[in-house]
């Protein structure tokens, strides 16, 4: 795998530059504030790959232009991707701020009475607003004593939320989206918009025809020893579901083995195309060994591939999961049907949480009345207002079965660095692999089938592009729901029972698109969505504001909405502010 240095967090202690007593009295307190911030972030955060987060602190406190420039030189040489400026006192506003136009930045002004940290915070934010370089404000709710070195809970929450989102921004910058194929069945998300990736995400698009995948398979441009390992792993761990095809379309054992072999090869080759593989250089394929520096990918599949070759279901499901024949590892981000916009939502979720993402069709709204009519069952609990059936043949991560457990024994999806091999095995054991339905996939394949455990908090997201407006983000926090087995079976067999299912109940607010479950479904902007573990909508909102992507729909509590301070100057309604600010500032990487 090609190694590119991970972005670091820069910590900028700023100080009142007046000597003869003022600066000298503040040096230790200011630098300790920077060190405490760095300690918090390195203890609480990891990169999505699992590596520890590193912080870089300015060599000196920053009182003016010269020290700000020296700090910037250090940060530029150490791949600092976001900055946090900290101070307990008055400093010189525009002389000390971080002026990099694309680097996410926050300022923590200490809430104390001895020195006016809050006054500097306000002055510096005014400079940021006037110069068109938005910054996030961090200011504790309660006054602290000057010698109090603790970080209050509300300050910690903002520091961590800012840092998670800022690391996501910095990690995406300079990477690529691998578009393997073109437009799938007219799905708009697979009309890959290069300008969106370049201007809003700082990414490139690598467009590769699906014949490149065919070439790699046919010419054995892969690690043959690894293929044997993958086959042995599948033989040990795969349970096969019923073949629902008519007799004339069912494959014999030899044909089924060939389909499995090619499905695993597809996973290997797509992975190698994304990140490279030094083993390919060993067999003389140096160019192919480099990969495309892809942090996310999409596979068109339907129909130009799937009408004659095995579909991408197995490859996508395995790649998006946190484990394979090599053990537990970081999940990849691979969007089925090359839905690049759902792929971006997956990428955001993975970068914010380090977890696998569940790709799904937003297939059916089931009202309580309809379920009672069809099954005789009356919905209650989380499901009492109705549920949405999330189901897709393709790339739902097997982690989505929720056979992993948190510290209290509850079902969940964990960051890959916390997953045990036993938990990975449990997810595999909960999954059946069903022969693909011939009417959809003439080339065959295997679709994973599992049922997500109930009562698990999830956040469903989706990015859409609106002509004349640009990208927008949708967010719906809610829970998975467990239905009685007979009820699930009746409902599931009305669609395609060979695919993975999550029954989802969004949290309702009684207003707008969250008036009821029907309205959530009716306002969803496309046929696909992504499930990310936990109620993490607030993190998505912060990330979107950094990228200048307005949020058109969410059910996050207003007190958790955290955006740059300049948004407040764009009107009195916080969602209207978001639209006006994103339009005013334009995409983060303007083109």
Curated annotation (Swiss-Prot):
Gene3D superfamilies: 3.40.50.1070, L-fucose Isomerase, Chain A, domain 2, L-fucose/L-arabinose isomerase, C-terminal
InterPro entries assigned: Fuc/Ara_isomerase_C (IPR004216), Fuc_iso_dom3_sf (IPR038393), Fuc_isomerase_C (IPR015888), Fucose_iso_dom1_sf (IPR038391), Fucose_iso_N1 (IPR012888), Fucose_isomerase (IPR005763), Fucose_isomerase_dom2_sf (IPR038392), Fucose_isomerase_N/cen_sf (IPR009015)
Keywords: Carbohydrate metabolism, Cytoplasm, Fucose metabolism, Isomerase, Manganese, Metal-binding
Cofactor list: Mn(2+)
Coiled coil: none
An annotated GO cellular component: cytoplasm
Enzyme Commission no: 5.3.1.25
Biological processes annotated in GO: D-arabinose catabolic process; L-fucose catabolic process
Pathway: Carbohydrate degradation; L-fucose degradation; L-lactaldehyde and glycerone phosphate from L-fucose: step 1/3
Binding site for Mn(2+): 337, 361, 528
Sample GO molecular function, one term: L-fucose isomerase activity
Localization per Swiss-Prot or TrEMBL: Cytoplasm
SUPFAM superfamilies per record: FucI/AraA C-terminal domain-like, FucI/AraA N-terminal and middle domains
Catalyzed reactions per annotation: L-fucose = L-fuculose
Domain of life, source organism: Bacteria
Residues annotated as catalytic: 337, 361
Root EC class: isomerase
Presence of the UniProt keyword Glycoprotein in the record: no
Record NCBIfam families: fucI, PRK10991.1
Subunit structure: Homohexamer.
PANTHER family reported for this sequence: L-FUCOSE ISOMERASE
Chain's role: Converts the aldose L-fucose into the corresponding ketose L-fuculose.
Family, as annotated: Belongs to the L-fucose isomerase family.
Protein's name according to its UniProt entry: L-fucose isomerase
Organism annotation: Escherichia coli O157:H7
């Amino acid at each position: 795998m090609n190694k590119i240095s991970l972005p670091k967090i820069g910590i900028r202690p700023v100080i009142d530059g007046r000597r003869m007593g003022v600066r000298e009295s503040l040096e230790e307190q200011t630098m300790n504030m920077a060190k405490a911030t760095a300690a918090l972030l390195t203890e609480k955060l990891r990169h999505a790959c699992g590596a520890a987060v590193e912080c870089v602190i300015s060599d000196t406190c920053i009182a003016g232009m010269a020290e700000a420039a020296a700090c910037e030189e250090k940060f530029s040489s150490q791949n600092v991707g976001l900055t946090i400026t900290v101070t307990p006192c008055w400093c010189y506003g525009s002389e000390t701020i971080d002026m990099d136009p694309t680097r996410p930045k926050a300022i923590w002004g200490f809430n104390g009475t001895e020195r006016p940290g809050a006054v500097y915070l306000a002055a510096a934010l005014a400079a940021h607003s006037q110069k068109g370089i938005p910054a996030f404000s961090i200011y504790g709710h309660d006054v602290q004593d000057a010698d109090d070195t603790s970080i209050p809970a509300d300050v910690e929450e903002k520091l961590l939320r800012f840092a998670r989102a800022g690391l996501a921004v910095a990690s995406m910058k300079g990477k690529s989206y691998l578009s393997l194929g073109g437009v799938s069945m007219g799905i708009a998300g697979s009309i890959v918009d290069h300008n969106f990736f370049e201007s809003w995400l700082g990414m490139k698009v690598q467009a590769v025809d699906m014949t490149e995948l065919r070439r790699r398979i046919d010419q054995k441009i892969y690690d043959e020893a690894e293929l044997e390992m993958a086959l042995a792993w599948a033989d040990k761990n795969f349970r096969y579901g019923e073949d629902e095809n008519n007799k004339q379309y069912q494959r014999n054992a030899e044909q089924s083995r060939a389909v499995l072999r090619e499905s695993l090869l597809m996973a290997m080759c797509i992975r190698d195309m994304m990140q490279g593989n030094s083993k390919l250089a060993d067999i003389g394929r140096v160019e192919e060994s480099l990969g495309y520096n892809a942090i996310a990918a999409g596979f068109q599949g339907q129909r130009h591939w799937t009408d004659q070759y095995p579909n991408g279901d197995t490859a996508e499901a395995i790649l998006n999961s946190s484990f394979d024949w090599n053990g537990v590892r970081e999940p990849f981000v691979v969007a089925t049907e090359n839905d690049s916009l759902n792929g971006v939502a997956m990428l955001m979720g993975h970068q914010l949480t380090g977890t696998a993402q569940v790709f799904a069709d937003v297939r059916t709204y089931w009202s309580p009345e309809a379920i009672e009519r069809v099954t005789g069952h009356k919905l209650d609990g989380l499901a009492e207002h109705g549920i949405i059936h999330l189901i897709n043949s393709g790339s739902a991560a097997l982690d989505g079965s929720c056979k992993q457990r948190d510290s209290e024994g509850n079902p969940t999806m964990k960051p890959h660095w916390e997953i045990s091999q036993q938990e990975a095995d449990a997810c595999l054991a909960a999954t059946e692999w069903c022969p693909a339905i011939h009417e959809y996939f003439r080339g065959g394949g295997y679709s994973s089938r599992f049922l997500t455990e109930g009562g698990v908090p999830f956040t469903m997201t989706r990015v859409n592009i609106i002509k004349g407006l640009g990208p927008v983000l949708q967010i719906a926090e809610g829970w998975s729901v467990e239905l009685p087995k007979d009820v699930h079976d009746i409902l599931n067999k009305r669609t395609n029972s060979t695919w993975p299912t999550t029954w989802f109940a969004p949290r309702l607010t009684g207003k707008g698109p969250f008036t009821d479950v029907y309205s959530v479904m009716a306002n969803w902007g496309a046929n696909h969505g992504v499930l990310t573990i936990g109620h993490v909508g607030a993190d998505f909102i912060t990330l979107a504001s950094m990228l200048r992507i307005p949020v058109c729909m969410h059910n996050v509590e207003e007190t958790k909405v955290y955006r740059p301070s300049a948004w407040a100057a764009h009107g009195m309604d916080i969602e209207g502010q978001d639209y006006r600010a994103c339009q005013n500032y334009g995409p983060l990487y303007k083109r």
